[in-house]
């Protein structure tokens, strides 16, 4: 009899434990659902804040572009390009400095085997039919043609959008105040915050946003101001000097001096590291 009572007690105890475990499980599931809802809400808030930030950046860029246009109308030129050639001795720029510049500043075409379909400057917008300033270079190419990074950089913006103006949009932040952006893409090959090297595939040509056909809208900016991309697209080691006279608004002399100092410091550091090795081998 005592054994039966003992067994019944154990069963009762185990049943209570099961009920308690089930209750705990339901509680944890409810907490998990609540946390999932919180995470989803935070993600939605993050997307909203990112979108708002990008909208404000675009408005700031528009204001900057309008100021630049006004300066051109008024004849204001703070780049002092007229005396640049006399101050900048391009022949004295070493091969090391040239390689640094060509790795860090956008150059070459971001799309191979493409056709330049619309240049930088005032034009009639093919979608709206209105006259407006086109702040980039368009490249016509088949859908899913690879887009390459024109210089080392970090992915600053990745914004998916199939219907809004720029469509699927990506922006790279390069060195020395330069940035490049890519609109109407079909898909991305990189994520925000990712570092890329010159020549890496960053995405593919598409027809997203306000677009009349598959193409890439390519922009280059310096400290937020748009520049004509064509001189950069045509720039390379064989015509290295041309960029300094074709692109205004950049203090090239100051930039090159900065790079020369960096390269010199790196060479000195390399020499110091090599000195003990040479001494030990003698």
What positions do the PLM features span?
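Non-catalytic extracellular/periplasmic "stalk"
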Residues: 3, 7-115, 119, 242, ...
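Conserved, short, structured surface segments that act as functional micro-motifs
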Residues: 116, 166-174, 194-258
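Zn2+-dependent peptidoglycan hydrolase active-site motif and core
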Residues: 132, 149-192, 214-215
């Amino acid at each position: 009899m005592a054994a039966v009572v003992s067994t019944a007690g154990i069963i009762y105890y185990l049943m209570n434990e099961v009920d308690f475990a089930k209750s705990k499980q339901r509680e944890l599931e409810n907490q998990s659902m609540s946390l999932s809802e919180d995470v989803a809400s935070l993600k939605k808030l993050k997307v909203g804040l990112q979108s708002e930030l990008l909208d404000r950046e675009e408005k700031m860029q528009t204001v900057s572009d309008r100021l630049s246009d006004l300066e051109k109308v008024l004849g204001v030129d703070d780049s002092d390009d007229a005396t640049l050639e006399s101050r900048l001795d391009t022949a004295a720029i070493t091969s090391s400095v040239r390689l640094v510049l060509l790795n860090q500043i956008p150059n070459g075409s971001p799309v191979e085997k493409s056709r330049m379909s619309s240049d930088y400057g005032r034009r009639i917008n093919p979608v709206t039919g209105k006259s407006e300033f086109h702040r980039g270079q368009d490249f016509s190419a088949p859908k899913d043609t690879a887009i390459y990074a024109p210089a080392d950089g970090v992915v600053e913006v990745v914004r998916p959008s199939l219907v809004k103006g720029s469509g699927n949009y990506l922006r790279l932040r390069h060195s020395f105040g330069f940035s490049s952006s890519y609109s109407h893409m079909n898909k991305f090959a990189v994520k925000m915050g990712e570092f890329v090297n010159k020549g890496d595939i960053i995405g593919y040509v598409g027809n997203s946003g306000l677009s009349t056909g598959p193409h890439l809208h390519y922009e280059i900016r310096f400290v937020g101001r748009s520049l004509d991309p064509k001189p950069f697209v045509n720039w390379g080691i064989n015509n290295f000097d041309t960029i300094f006279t074709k692109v205004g608004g950049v203090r090239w002399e100051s930039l090159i001096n900065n790079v020369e100092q960096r390269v010199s410091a790196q060479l000195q550091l390399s020499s110091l590291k090599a000195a003990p090795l040479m001494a030990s081998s003698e």
